[in-house]
C-alpha cells in the first residue's frame, strides 16, 4: 500500500475541513487569504452538468482554487514528460487509467440521458487528483504490478473505481481511495497475468 496515500486518506477522513482549505489571492488588494470553499470538482459534484462556473481552461493551466496537486494539469503534464524522457515511468498505467476513466464517464453521461458533454468530461479529467494520481502515484514501483498485462489491468481497475467513487459516492474525489484499493489487488493481478514458467507442465521423457 502506498504510505503517502494512506496518510492522506486518514487526514481527509479525520480533518476534512483543514484538508480542503486553500489559499486565494486578491489581486486588487495584493493579499493572500486562506478560506474554505468548494473546489471545481466539488462544485461539479454538487451542481452536475448545469454548473457553468467550472472552466476547463482555467483547470488546465491552474488558475483555480484547490488542494495541493489538483490545481494545474499543465504543470503535472510537464513533470510527467520529464519522467517519461528519463524513462522513470512508462505510458501503460497512466494512459490506461485516464482512458478507462474517460470511457466510464462517457457511458455515465449517455446512460443518464444527459448526452455527451465535453466540458463535463474534461472537468473530471483535469479536476481533482486524477492527473496527479495517474502520473505520479499510480506509477509507484513498489505498489504496482510488474507484468505488462498486469499494468493494463491495474490501470483499468483504477479508472473504473475512481469513476464509481466520484459519480456515485458521497465525496467529490476518489483517486486516493481507488489507488489504495487497487494496491491491495496487486498480488492477485500479478498471479493472474504472469506468464507461465518455461517448460512447466511438460511431459517427462
Each language-model region and where it sits:
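Structural signature of hydrophobic alpha-helical transmembrane segments
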Residues: 63-73, 118-130
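Cytosolic-side transmembrane-helix boundaries in multi-pass membrane proteins
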Residues: 167-205
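Hydrophobic alpha-helical transmembrane segments in multi-pass integral membrane proteins
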Residues: 18, 22, 108-114, 160-173
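Short juxtamembrane and helix-loop transition motifs at transmembrane-helix boundaries
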Residues: 51-63, 79-87, 109-119, 135-145
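Cytoplasmic-side transmembrane-helix entry/capping segments in multi-pass membrane proteins
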Residues: 1-9, 91-99, 124-127, 148-154
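Loop-to-transmembrane alpha-helix initiation sites
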Residues: 4, 121-128, 151, 170-182
Amino acid at each position: 500500500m502506498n504510505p503517502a496515500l494512506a496518510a492522506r486518506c486518514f487526514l481527509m477522513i479525520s480533518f476534512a475541513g483543514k484538508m480542503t482549505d486553500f489559499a486565494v489571492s486578491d489581486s486588487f488588494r495584493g493579499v493572500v487569504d486562506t478560506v474554505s470553499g468548494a473546489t471545481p470538482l466539488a462544485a461539479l459534484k454538487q451542481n452536475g452538468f448545469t454548473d457553468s462556473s467550472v472552466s476547463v481552461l482555467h483547470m488546465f493551466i491552474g488558475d483555480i482554487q484547490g488542494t495541493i496537486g489538483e490545481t494545474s494539469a499543465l504543470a503535472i503534464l510537464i513533470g510527467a514528460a520529464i519522467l517519461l524522457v528519463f524513462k522513470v515511468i512508462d505510458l501503460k498505467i497512466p494512459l490506461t487509467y485516464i482512458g478507462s476513466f474517460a470511457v466510464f464517464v462517457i457511458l455515465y453521461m449517455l446512460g443518464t440521458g444527459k448526452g455527451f458533454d465535453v466540458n463535463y468530461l474534461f472537468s473530471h479529467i483535469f479536476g481533482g487528483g486524477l492527473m496527479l494520481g495517474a502520473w505520479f502515484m499510480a506509477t509507484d514501483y513498489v505498489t504496482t504490478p510488474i507484468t505488462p498485462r498486469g499494468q493494463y489491468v491495474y490501470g483499468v481497475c483504477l479508472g473504473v473505481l475512481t469513476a464509481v467513487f466520484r459519480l456515485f459516492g458521497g465525496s467529490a474525489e476518489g483517486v486516493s481511495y481507488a489507488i489504495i484499493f487497487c494496491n491491495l489487488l496487486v498480488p492477485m493481478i500479478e498471479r493472474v497475468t504472469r506468464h507461465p514458467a518455461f517448460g512447466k507442465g511438460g511431459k517427462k521423457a
